[in-house]
Regions:
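Dinucleotide-binding Rossmann-like beta1-alpha1 core, especially the glycine-rich loop
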Residues: 57-133, 279-282
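Beta1/beta-strand and adjacent pyrophosphate-binding region of the FAD-binding site
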Residues: 10-24
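Short beta-strand to alpha-helix junction loop
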Residues: 71-72, 100-108, 145-164, 307-313, ...
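Short hydrophobic core segments
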Residues: 17-19, 198-210, 376
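Helical element adjacent to the flavin cofactor pocket in flavoenzyme catalytic cores
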Residues: 145-194, 198
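Active-site substrate-recognition segment that forms the wall
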Residues: 30-31, 59, 91-93, 209-335, ...
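Glycine-rich FAD pyrophosphate-binding loop
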Residues: 34-53
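Flavin (FAD/FMN) cofactor-binding core of flavoprotein oxidoreductases
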Residues: 129-132, 152, 301-303, 307-371, ...
Length: 404
């Protein structure tokens, strides 16, 4: 993917420096620029390499369960259909049928109460109805299923759309490795990189799973964790998935709640811990170009460079996905791993970091595609003079992240 970057003024003092050009950084940098701020977006890679690059791109705006999340999901559902036009870029947004599979040794009735809590309750399906929606499913692997409409984008195209619109608004992008922060007394005045020093009135950390270690190296603590997500990506295939397939009993959220609890927070400042055992959520999505991503394994390992047996992981995912979607078991594909940030209370960290003037964070999204675009818009308006109670409630200093 070829991109041209806006002119970078080395001596300029930007209103905002945004660290990280994944989904979070690309969205919030665009919204800040749209609010009239001068913005520098910094990332060590010239194209997406992290969690967004290997995401399914699923937009679960049906899945809000609290008043806050339901409101954000509703805003997201309204925002996405207009986003390609707003950005003047095809982000490949579409709505697909989502099939939530219930395993053959499980009981669909166990999920009816959970469904009633969602903003849009998934509809229960018989096995025959599930196969009508997705013929690639293995009848023997199911005791039932649920369905609802699910948004989807090509993640890399969404980033490219935000970046291109950002540059048209005068935003600048630097490919640089952030090494630390420039300070004047108790206030941050910029960042130190392998390409030099960049100055800014505010620094916004949006580099996902790497945010904690970057801040820790400067003596700053945040309660954000990460998982190692593993999946398999194929080249364009003739196989045609009609739907997005995911398990009804998604285990990743329980892993995040336990691994991100205040009681385990200190472990994340030490390498070598497996905070909770790994899980495997069997799912798959096919993009418009024919490529398929399926998996996924999630591991709560505190070392971002932890050694993982890729061959065994790939076999485990192929076996699991091959049971539910047999045609995918032996397709050509490559194992990938990325780091996925999260917070134990399933809400992101947004706002100023206490004790360090000029330093802010926008990170830790557990369900990013569903809630991030409206929060990026709200945050940019909030820091541009339009106070927002929702942004205030997502402070990195909020009580739900602390031991009681």
């Amino acid at each position: 993917m070829t991109r041209t970057y806006a002119f970078l003024e080395m001596g300029m003092v930007y209103d905002w420096i945004v660290i990280g050009n994944g989904l979070t950084g690309s969205a919030v940098s665009y919204e800040l620029a749209a609010n009239g701020q001068t913005v520098l977006l910094v990332d060590r890679h010239g194209s997406p390499q992290g969690a967004t690059r290997f995401s399914y791109g699923g937009i679960a705006y049906w899945s809000g369960t609290t008043p806050l999340l339901k409101q954000l999901c509703q805003e997201s559902q309204e925002q996405y259909p207009q986003l390609s036009a707003e950005l003047d870029y095809d982000i490949q947004f579409r709505e697909l049928d989502l099939v939530l599979t219930v395993a053959d040794d499980d009981d669909p009735a166990a999920y009816t109460d959970r469904c009633s809590q969602y903003l849009v309750a998934p509809t229960q399906l018989s096995i025959d109805e599930a196969l009508d929606l997705e013929p690639m499913l293995n009848r023997s692997a199911l005791s039932g299923a649920f369905t609802t409409k699910h948004g989807n984008v090509k993640p890399e195209e969404l980033i490219a759309g935000y970046n291109n619109a950002f540059k048209r608004l005068g935003g600048a992008i630097a490919i640089a490795q952030v090494k630390g922060f420039q300070r004047q007394g108790d206030r941050l005045t910029g960042i130190l990189t392998d390409q030099g020093t960049f100055s800014g009135a505010n620094v916004l950390v949006s580099n996902g799973a790497l945010a904690r270690s970057l801040l820790r190296d400067s003596g700053i603590h945040i309660s954000q964790c990460f998982s190692h997500a593993e999946l398999i990506e194929t080249p364009p295939l003739e196989h045609q998935l009609r739907t997005i397939v995911m398990p009804m009993n998604i285990q990743r959220f329980a892993l995040e709640a336990t691994a991100g609890a205040p009681e385990t927070d200190a472990l994340w400042d030490e390498d070598g811990h497996e905070v909770v055992p790994p899980i495997l959520d069997t799912g798959a999505v096919q993009f418009l170009d024919g490529t398929i991503r399926f998996g996924q394994i999630s591991r709560a390992l505190t070392d971002p460079d932890a050694v993982i047996d890729a061959a065994q992981s790939e076999q485990d995912m192929r076996d699991a996905v091959g049971y539910v979607l047999p045609e995918l078991k032996d397709v050509t594909g490559t194992w990938h791993r990325c780091l996925v940030s999260f917070c134990g209370d399933r809400l992101p960290l947004i706002g100023p970091i206490p004790s360090t003037d000029g330093l802010h964070i926008f990170s830790g999204f557990s369900n990013p595609f569903a809630i991030l675009p409206p929060l990026a818009k709200r945050y940019a308006a909030h820091v541009s003079g339009d106070p927002d109670d929702i942004i205030t409630r997502l402070s990195p200093d909020r009580p739900s992240l602390k031991l009681t």
